[in-house]
Curated annotation (Swiss-Prot):
The keyword Cytoplasm does not apply. GO terms for biological process: protoporphyrinogen IX biosynthetic process. It comes from Dictyostelium discoideum (Social amoeba). The gene is cpox. InterPro entries: Coprogen_oxidase_aer (IPR001260), Coprogen_oxidase_aer_sf (IPR036406). This is Oxygen-dependent coproporphyrinogen-III oxidase. GO terms for molecular function: coproporphyrinogen oxidase activity. It comes from the Eukaryota. NCBIfam families: PRK05330.1. Belongs to the aerobic coproporphyrinogen-III oxidase family. The lineage of its organism: Eukaryota, Amoebozoa, Evosea, Eumycetozoa, Dictyostelia.
Length: 332
């Protein structure tokens, strides 16, 4: 199915669009974190074909106890806000699809393929600022093509009104640029996200969800417009958390709980994440694939937070909920 109203995007337009998304998000992160915390840039070449990528990575200071001083954290605007983060752009072209990936996608192994997109993860220092992940991508092999992507939020100390606003912003993007017939509606994307970002061995979701889309292959022009706008929406989605929550003081208990909860993030990425599996199977760039992992995390044996604590409150958020219809009288 093709659109009769809009021109079909070219490979070059899609590539340049993703690069623009990376640039805009990086500008936003630098400005919003005060301008002093810069990323390191790593340009790399795809050795098994042509193309490559640009990885932009933030790694904060590592002094022990540096981010446990409440007065410093709440008053000094020069404090690093991103402990570990990255915004990666890639565009690769190969002449032979790796056999493992070919089997997964039911494509002949000797088929030329193109893969491009932007992937990002931000792990903040402050436990009151959620971790966020976003991915927008395009894949083409022979006559087969599709778009995919999504965004999801992983808070440690969630506030209901902020979670509702996050989902409201996502719904606005879907209402304006998505289509039910193109499988890019908010309802479908949210349901897929709740299902995908689930840890079966823990019986909980990774966070408070968001949107997840994969193998979108209907109406290339409209789907590209949706994916492009979804990528740019990151700024509106994350700005309230980064601006409003970074100045909230926190103590050692909260920092320790943040590190403990990050272990769930690592478990999901290494055990279940399709992007990680595909990257490894397709002999992708390991540094870029594992960029999403936090700098520090902890596991505690059989740990359970005490009842009626902010730490226990998080667990009530880690299940699929109809966020847009939550009772605002029960704000946390």
């Amino acid at each position: 199915m093709t659109s009769t109203n809009e021109p079909i995007p070219t490979e070059e337009e899609i590539k340049n669009g993703f690069k623009f998304i990376q640039d805009e998000i990086c500008k936003f992160l630098i400005t919003t974190t005060g301008g002093h915390q810069q990323y390191s840039e790593d340009k790399w070449d795809y050795t098994k074909g042509s193309g490559g990528g640009i990885s932009r990575v933030w790694e904060g200071k590592e002094e022990e106890g540096f981010y446990l001083n409440q007065d410093y954290q709440s008053q000094n605007n020069k404090c690093d806000k991103i402990e570990k983060g990255g915004v990666n752009f890639s565009y690769i072209v190969g002449s032979n699809l790796p056999s493992a990936a070919a089997t997964q996608f039911k494509i002949a192994p000797d088929t030329k393929y193109i893969a491009t997109g932007v992937s990002l993860v931000i792990h903040p220092y402050n436990p009151n600022v959620p971790t966020i992940h976003m991915n927008v991508r395009y894949f083409e092999a022979g006559d087969v093509w599709w778009f995919g992507g999504g965004v999801d939020l992983t808070p440690v100390y969630p506030k209901l009104d902020q979670v509702v606003e996050f989902h409201s912003t996502l719904k606005k993007v879907c209402d304006q640029y998505g289509q039910e017939e193109n499988k890019t509606s908010y309802a479908l994307g949210k349901a897929e996200c709740d299902s995908y970002f689930f840890l079966p061995h823990r019986g909980e979701t990774r966070g408070v969800g968001g949107l997840f889309f994969d193998h979108l292959k209907s109406d290339k022009a409209k789907t590209w417009k949706f994916i492009y706008q979804l990528g740019l929406s990151f700024i509106d989605l994350y700005k309230p958390f980064l601006v409003n929550n970074s100045s909230i003081s926190y103590d050692k208990v909260q920092r320790e709980y943040q590190l403990y909860r990050r272990s769930r993030y690592v478990e999901f990425n290494l055990l279940f994440d399709r992007g990680t599996k595909f990257g490894i199977l397709s002999e992708g760039r390991t540094e870029s694939i594992l960029m999403s992992l936090p700098a520090v995390c902890k596991w505690k044996y059989n740990y359970k937070p005490e009842e009626n604590t902010p730490e226990a409150n998080l667990l009530t958020f880690l299940r699929p909920r109809d966020w847009l219809n939550e009772n605002q009288e029960n704000k946390n």
